[in-house]
């Protein structure tokens, strides 16, 4: 996403989210990619899905990082 191909990033992140639906960091990165592509409704839906998730045991720090980033992004796209 940093100077890269946003549509390609979205495609990879969508595949990753399907393969690892419990990966909170993958979901927040997907939301960020949607926002970068001005697809704010999809970014918000992804954030809503993330906020509804429960952390996977052993991955609480990553989950908390993703939640913090999601809330920050949510404020930015409103």
Task: Indicate where each model-derived feature is located.
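TPR/TPR-like (Sel1-like) alpha-helical repeat modules
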Residues: 35, 40-58
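Structural signature of tandem alpha-helical TPR/SEL1-like repeats
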Residues: 2-12, 39-45
């Amino acid at each position: 996403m940093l100077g890269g191909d946003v549509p390609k990033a979205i495609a990879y992140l969508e595949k990753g989210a399907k393969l690892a639906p419990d990966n909170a960091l993958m979901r927040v990165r997907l939301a960020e990619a949607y926002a970068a592509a001005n697809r704010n409704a999809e970014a918000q839906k992804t954030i809503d899905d993330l906020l509804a998730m429960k952390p996977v045991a052993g991955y609480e720090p990553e989950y908390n990082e993703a939640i913090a980033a999601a809330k920050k992004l949510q404020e930015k796209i409103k």
